Amino acid sequence: MEVVSKIDQENQAKIWKQIFGFAESLVLKCAVQLEIAETLHNNVKPMSLSELASKLPAQPVNEDRLYRILHFLVHMKLFNKDATTQKYSLAPPAKYLLKGWEKSMVPSILSVTDKDFTAPWNHLGDGLTGNCNAFEKALGKGIRVYMRENPEKDQLFNEGMACDTRLFASALVNECKSIFSDGINTLAGVGRGTGTAVKAISKAFPDIKCTIHDLPEITSKNSKISRDVFKSVPSADAIFMKSILHEWNDEECIQILKRCKEAIPKGGKVIIADVVIDMDSTHPYSKSRLAMDLAMMLHTGGKERTEEDWKKLIDAAGFASCKITKLSALQSVIEAYPH
C-alpha cells in the first residue's frame, strides 16, 4: 500500500474540511437557537458545563451532547474554554450572537441557514445545463411567489436583510459622510425591505428629506410611496438602492438604472449599495461575497458583480461616470453620475 505523503495528507484534510463545511453553519444556528451566548453573557462569569446546561432555556439538557456541541464551537473560536477550570466564556466574535443590540447578527444567521432558503443549494449544478431556477425546483415556485404565500418566511428574510443593513448603515454614515454632503437635499430610497438604511441616513443627516418607496414600514419623519421601479423612479437629488440590483440580471438592472437616471436632476446621482467582488482571496469578506453571488444565482437569477462589471453596467445605462468606495462592510458604495 502506498505511503501517504505529508502533502497528500494535507490535501485530503482540506477536502474533508470542505465536505463538512455545512457543519459550521448549522452548529452556529444551533448555538443561536439554544441561546448559549445569551446564557453565558447573562451569567457574567465563566460557566462550567453543568452550570451552563442548567441555565439554558431548553430543559432538560443532555450534558454529553451539549459538551460535544461546545467542543465544536470552541474549535470555531466562538467560545473559550479555560484549560484549568474547564469553564466556558464568550470569545470576541460571540457578541454578534447576542440578541437585542444593533449589531446582532442573529437574524442573518437564522435567515441564511433556514432549511427552505438552503434547499436550492442542492440544485446548484442543475442550472448549468439549462435555465433551471434552483429555488423553484427546490420549493415548487419562484422566490417572489413563495414569499407572498409564506409571510413568516418573508418576515424572516426581511429581518435578516435589516440585520445586514444595520451593519452596513453604520459603516456608511461613518465612513462616507462626503457622499451625502455635496448638494443633496432630497433622497429617495427604492427597494424591498424595512427602510433600515434610509432611516439611518435620515438620522445621520437630518437636513436631507428622505422618502421610502415600496417599503412596508416607515418612521414618522419619512414618507412612503408605492412604485414599480421598472416603470418609474421617484424624483430626488439622490436615488438610494441597497441590495436591489443584485437580484436582477444585467438587462433588468439597466432598465432600473435608466429609470433612475431619468428621475435625478443635473448634479444628482444614484447611490448603490451592493457587493463588489474582488479577486483578493485574502480579504476577510472575499468568501462571503462569492457565496452571496451563488446565493443570488440560486434564489433570484441575479448576481454579484466585480468592479469592472459595475462600470460596464452603469455605462450601458447611459451614465457618464461612477465612483466605487469600499467600506468595512460586506457591501461597497457605487455612485453613478449622469453628467
Curated annotation (Swiss-Prot):
EC number(s) stated in the UniProt entry for this protein: 2.1.1.117
Involved pathway(s): Alkaloid biosynthesis
Annotated keywords: Alkaloid metabolism, Methyltransferase, S-adenosyl-L-methionine, Transferase
InterPro entries in UniProt: COMT-like (IPR016461), O_MeTrfase_dom (IPR001077), Plant_O-MeTrfase_dimerisation (IPR012967), SAM-dependent_MTases_sf (IPR029063), WH-like_DNA-bd_sf (IPR036388), WH_DNA-bd_sf (IPR036390)
GO molecular function terms noted in the UniProt entry: (S)-scoulerine 9-O-methyltransferase activity; O-methyltransferase activity; protein dimerization activity
Keyword Lyase: no
Residues noted as binding substrate in the record, renumbered to the chain: 164, 243-247
EC top class, as a word: transferase
One example of a Gene Ontology biological process annotation: alkaloid metabolic process
Catalysed reaction equations from the record: (S)-scoulerine + S-adenosyl-L-methionine = (S)-tetrahydrocolumbamine + S-adenosyl-L-homocysteine + H(+)
Entry-linked SUPFAM superfamilies: S-adenosyl-L-methionine-dependent methyltransferases, Winged helix' DNA-binding domain
Signal peptide: none
KW Transit peptide (keyword) present: no
Record-listed S-adenosyl-L-methionine binding positions: 161, 165, 191, 214, 228-229, 242
Catalytic site: 246 (proton acceptor)
Function as written in the Swiss-Prot or TrEMBL entry: Methyltransferase involved in the biosynthesis of the benzylisoquinoline alkaloid noscapine. Catalyzes the conversion of (S)-scoulerine to (S)-tetrahydrocolumbamine.
Recorded family membership: Belongs to the class I-like SAM-binding methyltransferase superfamily. Cation-independent O-methyltransferase family. COMT subfamily.
Protein's name according to its UniProt entry: Probable scoulerine-9-O-methyltransferase OMT3B
Organism placement in taxonomy: Eukaryota, Viridiplantae, Streptophyta, Embryophyta, Tracheophyta
Name of the gene encoding the protein in the UniProt record: OMT3B
